């Protein structure tokens, strides 16, 4: 399959370990996976490429995933990109 026919996926997370883990889950021969470490970095990639899916970390310093999604939805070029929100934040559960 030529590179032109690959689906482009964007993963946005400020933690390199999370980027690697998500990449390992979704990468295959028919996908090109792009990484961004911040909302600003993601916006630059969104202007350059047409993505089939964006996976956004909810909690990042600066622009969080929800703010990035709001900007994406407000722009014609990116408003129809499906978004998946992820978070590595844990919480103590008292059962």
Language-model features: locations:
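Active-site beta3 strand of CheY-like receiver
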Residues: 49-55
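Receiver (REC) domain active-site loop signature in two-component systems and cognate sites
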Residues: 60
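Short, conserved "switch-loop" micro-motifs in signal-transduction and mechanochemical regulators
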Residues: 75, 89-90
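Receiver (REC) domain alpha4 helix and immediately following alpha4-beta5 loop
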Residues: 94-95
């Amino acid at each position: 399959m030529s590179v032109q026919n690959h689906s482009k996926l964007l993963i946005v997370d400020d933690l390199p370990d999370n980027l690697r883990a998500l990449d390992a889950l979704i990468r295959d021969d028919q996908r090109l996976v792009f990484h961004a470490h911040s909302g600003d970095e993601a916006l630059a990639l969104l202007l350059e490429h047409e993505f089939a899916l964006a996976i956004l970390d909810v909690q990042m310093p600066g622009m969080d995933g929800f703010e990035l999604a709001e900007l994406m939805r407000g722009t014609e070029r990116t408003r129809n990109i499906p978004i998946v929100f992820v978070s590595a934040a844990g919480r103590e559960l008292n059962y």
